[in-house]
């Protein structure tokens, strides 16, 4: 499952690492968009296969942030 950005913004903090086991609703990262902090959470459980962003990165709408399997 790909976790994607819904709007442009900046990554404030990444809360997971590759290999972490997640439950549905687990916090993956925090981003700032439109001067507001937004929590990005997993829609379903799984294992973090890949992180596509780091703290401080700028992201665009539709950009893949992480891959969960």
UniProtKB/Swiss-Prot annotation:
SUPFAM superfamilies, alphabetized: Single hybrid motif
Post-translational modification N6-biotinyllysine, affected residues: 35
One annotated Gene Ontology cellular component of this protein: cytoplasm
Localization annotation: Cytoplasm
Keywords: Biotin, Cytoplasm, Decarboxylase, Lyase
GO function term, MF aspect, one: carboxy-lyase activity
Enzyme Commission numbers on file: 4.1.1.-
Residue ranges of every copy of the Biotinyl-binding domain listed in the record: 1-69
First-tier enzyme category under EC: lyase
PROSITE patterns: BIOTINYL_LIPOYL
Pfam family, one: Biotin_lipoyl
Its biological purpose: Biotin-carrier subunit of the biotin-dependent malonate decarboxylase multienzyme complex (EC 7.2.4.4). The carboxyl group of the carboxylated biotin carrier is released by the membrane-bound carboxybiotin decarboxylase MADB.
Listed name of the protein: Biotin carrier protein MADF
Species, as recorded: Malonomonas rubra
């Amino acid at each position: 499952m790909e976790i994607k950005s819904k709007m442009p913004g900046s990554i404030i903090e990444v809360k997971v690492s590759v290999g972490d086991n997640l439950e549905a609703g687990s916090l993956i990262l925090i981003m700032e968009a439109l001067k507001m902090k937004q929590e990005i959470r997993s829609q379903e459980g799984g294992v973090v296969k890949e992180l596509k962003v780091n703290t401080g990165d700028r992201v665009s709408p539709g950009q893949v942030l992480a891959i969960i399997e």
